[in-house]
Amino acid sequence: MESQLWNWILPLLISSLLISFVAFYGFFVKPKRNGLRHDRKTVSTVTSDVGSVNITGDTVADVIVVGAGVAGSALAYTLGKDKRRVHVIERDLSEPDRIVGELLQPGGYLKLLELGIEDCVEEIDAQRVYGYALFKNGKRIRLAYPLEKFHEDVSGRSFHNGRFIQRMREKAASLPNVQLEQGTVLSLLEENGTIKGVRYKNKAGEEQTAFAALTIVCDGCFSNLRRSLCNPQVEVPSCFVGLVLENCNLPYANHGHVVLADPSPILMYPISSTEVRCLVDVPGQKVPSIANGEMKNYLKTVVAPQMPHEVYDSFIAAVDKGNIKSMPNRSMPASPYPTPGALLMGDAFNMRHPLTGGGMTVALADIVVLRNLLRPLRDLSDGASLCKYLESFYTLRKPVAATINTLANALYQVFCSSENEARNEMREACFDYLGLGGMCTSGPVSLLSGLNPRPLTLVCHFFAVAVYGVIRLLIPFPSPKRIWLGAKLISGASGIIFPIIKAEGVRQMFFPATVPAYYYKAPTVGETKCS
């Protein structure tokens, strides 16, 4: 009976919801793109005091890259391989020690292949990842990545973030036209509205300037330069508490594990042949103190009882060992100020909740888009013309970026427990929907993995989950209370996803062909406008 209702009611309800959504947002939400340039009030750049800067000589680079993390290193190698002179300035060239940026989705691995840097996941004891396992109240389901149509080498990868970054830095520095320097960038140099380079302190503490036709800021989630180039609206919905479980046998080998715990999810995935990363999400911006032992007590009394029994002992041992780290989870929609001579990339530009491990996939996909836009250009010195042309970047990146961003931020809200009964019904419906198999499983997983970055498909599945939850409530008897709860479930689902979509940009996300910048062509030398 439930199956028959599903087959008849679901398509009708989804269609009506989507029509309402497209009609309302397509006609009544004004695109945020207009006026971005005019909203630019406070600029933290400094005006160059060196007079007129000639950036056509041999003493300057074509591109300055600020930051040599995942985005900066990959970008430096990519542009260097295209014969650009690249100057990379990184605050600290020692191996990073982070608790995020350790899971690369299959879609991100495809971008590594496209950029020619797939060898950077070799020789670092990286582990292949073939899907996810979800756990909730004693139930468990396995979600496999839909990899059948891809080469056998294509899968997710998990690793120590620092090892991966060091491999990419070495790859970039191996090119003779890429200069990798340790230094702290203090500010951008601006002359007549165009960014001409940066002011920085080198490793010896000496203040210097560097000039280039294009400066790309990739200085990460703590960026101190982004305010010059975008309108940062950073939210911190939660914090991750990270541990390393040693010699731990996960219930499903070579899979990411998500425990739908109370109050919020727990993640686990292998980062080497002997280590498993465990990330405990703590809602809000304040976490129990690690120093006075509150955190250990929280992990043992609240978190440990909800862990799968296979990892319980390893989890307790990791807590007792005491190597516990925490970091805030940031989310920030891309809201750029198109600026001649400069561009933002990576976490400095756009962030989403790290629940789905999509950050590196977005960054690498952005680099592919930017590389393809810059390849036809021999000369980058016309800042105004280049800036106009690169406005297309913000639209062309949307299919991948908006899909992964929206899914990550929406899924986090769905996966957290709540005192709201309708929200908890949505959580239950999502877990059971993913376990139905067929398109109900492969569709969402292909979105999460970055293999099928289609925003409309994401919206369809999101509301399919909501409608599935309503159908469950109405069977076997649709009492007034259950009908009201179903209405609140649909309303709650809309309240989750619509604000995220609005922040991403409805027009660019669903109707990119209506954005003029979508059609911009590469300018020729001397042009001031893009056709």
From Swiss-Prot:
Catalytic reactions on record: squalene + reduced [NADPH--hemoprotein reductase] + O2 = (S)-2,3-epoxysqualene + oxidized [NADPH--hemoprotein reductase] + H2O + H(+)
Gene Ontology terms for molecular function: flavin adenine dinucleotide binding; squalene monooxygenase activity
Keyword Membrane in record: yes
Tagged with keyword Flavoprotein: yes
Highest taxon, organism lineage: Eukaryota
Pathway: Terpene metabolism; lanosterol biosynthesis; lanosterol from farnesyl diphosphate: step 2/3
InterPro entries given in the database record: FAD/NAD-bd_sf (IPR036188), Squalene_epoxidase (IPR013698), Squalene_monox (IPR040125)
Subcellular location: Membrane
Impact after mutating residue 183 to R: In dry2/seq1-5; extreme sensitivity to dehydration and ectopic localization of RHD2 NADPH oxidase and ROS production
One Pfam family here: SE
Extra facts: SEQ4 or SEQ5 are unable to complement seq1 mutants.
Reported function: Catalyzes the stereospecific oxidation of squalene to (S)-2,3-epoxysqualene, and is considered to be a rate-limiting enzyme in steroid biosynthesis. Can produce not only oxidosqualene, but also 2,3:22,23-dioxidosqualene. Main squalene epoxidase in the root. Sqe1 mutants may show defects in membrane lipid rafts, impairing the correct localization of RHD2 NADPH oxidase and the proper polarized production of ROS.
Protein name, entry field: Squalene epoxidase 1
Organism of this sequence: Arabidopsis thaliana (Mouse-ear cress)
